[in-house]
Structures are given as structure tokens and as C-alpha cells.
Amino acid sequence: MAETVWAVFPPMLTIVLALATKEVYMSLLIGIFSGAMLYTDFNVLQTILTMFAVMEEKVGKNVNILVFLVILGIIVAAITRSGATAAYGSWAAKHIKGKRSSLLLTALLGLVIFIDDYFNCLTVGTVMRPITDKFKVSGAKLAYIIDATAAPVCILAPVSSWAAAVGSSLPEGSTIDGFGLFLQTIPINLYAILAMVFMVFIAWTGRDFGAMAAVVREERTSSAADEYSGDDDVKESKKVGKGTIADLMLPIFVLIAACVFGMLYTGGIMEGKGIADAFADCDSSKSLVLGSFIAFVFMALLYLPRRVISFNHFCECFGIGFKAMVPAIFILCLAWTMSGIVSDKYLNLGGYVGGIVNANASLGIFLPAIFFVVAMFLAFATGTSWGTFGILIPIAVAVVGVENYQGLVLAVASILSGAVAGDHASPISDTTILASAGAQCNHIEHVNTQLPYVLLVAACSFVGYIVDGITQNGWAGLGAGLICMAAVCAVIYTKLPVVEKDDK
């Protein structure tokens, strides 16, 4: 049943079950099992073997990400246990005035950390959660801000791991300059641009709607946000030390600097490559492990000699940090397995979707809009934007042709935009999972609350890509998308009440 309509069934079953039952683990397991059943023609024994073979392959390829998560969990636990987080929260309560300021500062930090989406999600959550907790900001709202400044920011940054992913998705032997093509897609990556515009609007005005408004109202009336919103495992990491703000900021600064250094190092900066080429060729997951380990060693040397925290309490952070990351690790492993089941090696969902795109190539002026919708669906169903790049960009090159370079730029931009939109909405996406982990928010609650926002921004982006196709001018599409977004924001501002009040 490979490369047929049945390839759509497992991810869609997973998503429907997750949204209906709010049980993401079981939903993923059922979806993976159904996909393996389809692949093995309902041979139960082969289904089980296939499931674990795919899991072994996918988790093995991503083990560096898991190590990074564990080390980061330990760092967060140690920072909290040292008392540095409490000191930072006290400082924030005096200097940051209200929810609006805390959310805008979260957004600003997300814009600054553009090198990698995984790193962005967890670092922004670690730094900003003490502040947003002080002002009783809903965990779902924080997760939305984190998610909206992860992939959408990275896909617009020339110096990021995402630029490399786009270049590597071009057909083998292509004469196209991948990095140059990526640079030209930046101003017409409509979803990424509009998502950040809308996110700032929501943070500034406090006007929420849909599931997000319901969650914010519930937390305001029940005072559920009076307590720290994290998991019990994170709560175990109580303050026992005498840390200061510097004991939080210095490890985070070293973490950022070390990860940037890791990307340059693994990309070949020491071999004479330029900065842009080094970022393009880096091994981002290995870089994150290297950077997090350097930050961990630095933190130990910063804390222990000064007796900010005792050696025994520091060692306790190993178990606490690991336990805090177990839910995210488990979901990631299952999500990677699901993406493996629908990969070209098994059910080949990408091949099926690619066939649909090729069959509609004659629609001409609507190609950017078609690529946007198809990329969004594919990323939503598989949970991977990079995989979507790899499937659809070669198809765009074949359909549009290198000779129509402006048309190719529009097509690739719409693919990148749609992939980020689908990734942003998908409950089985890595970045969605990590945004939930960074905000210590229930994962399905995060998916439910941000989905209406994603769809609204995607609709404005779709309008922009229709204009792009008609005019063959990316700036015209950007203008149309911004006008559409401005109209939506005006309606929300005039018709909806303030839900997230800016309490001082």
C-alpha cells in the first residue's frame, strides 16, 4: 500500500486521536502500528518487527538531540536548584511591568536565537518561564510565543541550520546556488513573516480567541497560574542554593556561544571555510550536544567552587533534569518513528503527494498557492518541515524549470512557507513538542490553542501566494498578505475583548 492514498491514513489517524482523546502517547503508538500494518499487508509479527526497526533507525539517527535534551534538562534543574531562577524572577518582578512586557520580551528573545529551532524552543522557555510565571501568563500562551519564534524565525535567517536544509534539498547535480536561492525566498516567505506579525499583535493587545481565550479565562478565574505550571519532576528542583541573576545568565550565554561555536566547528570553520559556508555545512545536532556539554562544564565550575550549590545537590540535578525531559523524549521518539513509517522507504506519503502535485502542474499561475497547501498538509501529516523540503523542492525544480528562475523562487518560497505552517500546527512536530516542553505546557493543550492562530495566518499567506502566482511578483504577494493580516488584526482588535489583561 506504499505511495497510495492509504499512506495518508496513519498520520491522520494519529492527529485525530490525539486531538479527540488528548492522549498523545497512545495516539502515536496506534498510528505507528496502523502504518506498519498497512506496510506489511496486515502481518502482525512483521508489523511489530517493522515498528521497532523503524524506531531503531530513526532514534539512532537523532540520538544527539536526545543527549542535548538530557544535558539541557540537567542545566535547567541545576539553575533552578541554585536559586538563580528565583533571583531572576524577583529581578523581573521589579523591572518588567506586566504580562505584555513579559510576552514581548519572550518574543524578542525568540527572534534573537535564530540559529536552530530546537535550541530556540528550550532556551527561550528556560529563560522566560520564571518571568511569565511571575505574571501568571498561561502556559499555552507562552508555548505559542515560543513556537511562533522558533521555525518561523529560523527559516528567515541566512545563518541557521535551516538554510543548510534548503540547499541540501535541491536535486543532485543541480546547477542552482542553493544558498542564493534561499536568500531570495526570505522576503516572500509569507507564513513566517505573517506568523511573527500576528504573534506580536496578540502579545501586545492581549486579545485572544478560540481555545486560547478559553484557557486564559479559565486560568484567570481559577488562579491555576498562581502555582508554577511545570511538571512535578521540575518542581522537585527546589531552590536550595544562593544563586544570583549572573548564575542564570552566564550559563545561558555560554550555552548560546558554545552552540554557535559548535556549528561553526562542525561546519569546517577551522578548515578555512567562511562563516556562511560553515553554518550551511554544520551538523546542528552534534553542535547542540557540544555546546550544551561545554555549558554544563562551565556551570559546574561556576557553581561548585563558590558553593552556590552543594556537590550532593548538584548531583541530584542529573536525575531531576533527566526525568523532566522524559515526556518530550518519549514523544519525539514516537514522532520520529511515525515520520519513518510514512517515509519513502515504507509507505512513501511524499511520493503520493508528489504525484498529485505533478498531476496539477498545468494550473500554472496557481502553482505557488498549490505548493503552499500541499507543503502545509505534508508537514502537518508527517511532523517534519525538513522532510517536506526534501520531497517538494525537487518536484518544484522539475515542474517550474531552472530557466524560469523567478517562478522557481516563488515556488520554493511557498514550499518553505507551507512546510513551516504545517510544522507549526502539527501535534507530532519536533518543534511543537519542544515548545510545549519549554513552556511546561500540556502538549495537546498547546496544539489546540495555537491551531486557530496558525490557520488564520495560513489563510492570509494563501491569499498572498495566489497574488504571487497571478503577478509573478513576490513583493505583490507580500503586500497582499500584509493587507489581509492587517484587516484580520483590525477586526480582532475592534470586535474582541481583552482576555490576557496586562496586570501590573
Predicted feature residues:
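Inter-helical loop and helix-membrane interface segments of multi-pass membrane transporters/permeases
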Residues: 2, 40-57, 164-188, 209-239, ...
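Membrane-embedded alpha-helical segments and adjacent helix-loop junctions characteristic
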Residues: 44-143, 308-403
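Hydrophobic transmembrane alpha-helices that form the pore/transport pathway of multi-pass ion
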Residues: 93-179, 381-421, 431-445, 485, ...
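Membrane-core helix-loop-helix motifs of multi-pass transport proteins
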Residues: 131-223, 237-247, 432-489
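C-terminal transmembrane helix pair
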Residues: 134-135, 326-330, 334-346, 361-389, ...
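Long, contiguous bundles of hydrophobic transmembrane helices that form the permeation core
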Residues: 182, 195-281, 293, 297-317, ...
